[in-house]
Amino acid sequence: EPGHAPVPGGHTISVLGPIPMPLTLCESNFDVQWYACVRNTELGKIQELADDLRAQEGQRSCATLASYMAVNSVMVIGDPESWENPLVRVHSSCLTGDVFGSQRCECGPQMHAALERITEAGGGLLVYMAGHEGRGIGLWAKAATYLLQDGGEDTYQSNESLGLPADSRDFSDAASLLKHFIGGKPFRLLTNNPKKVNDLGEHGVTGITRVKHVTGVSDCNRRYLSAK
């Protein structure tokens, strides 16, 4: 049965899990617990589309259903009952870095290093935000900003050239998931971004200690990181 995490505005997040996820971390095998998380407003759309798909067996409905299945994830490492001050990473999705291994950013190394650091520390969470691609502008717009950056603009200038905000990420769901999984316990947040700490705090998350998380720096992304 899915659990539920409340979200400001009267919504709730359906949390499906735990689902054992075997990973190799710190040169050892671990069964990390994976939870899939989706707002009930989105879950309702998924259920409606699934009913339509069963009735019509239409490829169009199948494609639309898949588009709504990009849900957030929580990876739980260790036993939450034993946590006193766990390590946490709230990670924004980055297809090019996390999946393709692109060195235009440091996202892939940051994600993998976070999992290792959380394991070494005895446990914690990685919250993976699926809707944060390109700091919230989406993959297509991100591709366009890359072309502008190759023409000399930095990561923020390229957003502005497209009429897009520098950072449009919404951390309300991340905050709700942190409160659901950690409760009121203090925790250490792996991030180089003080704004992320402030955004989570504005959504009611307390007890945060920021821990720097510098990794993945290369000649390919030095200009990008300098702008950040």
Feature names for model-found ranges:
Residues 1-228:
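Catalytic domains of riboflavin
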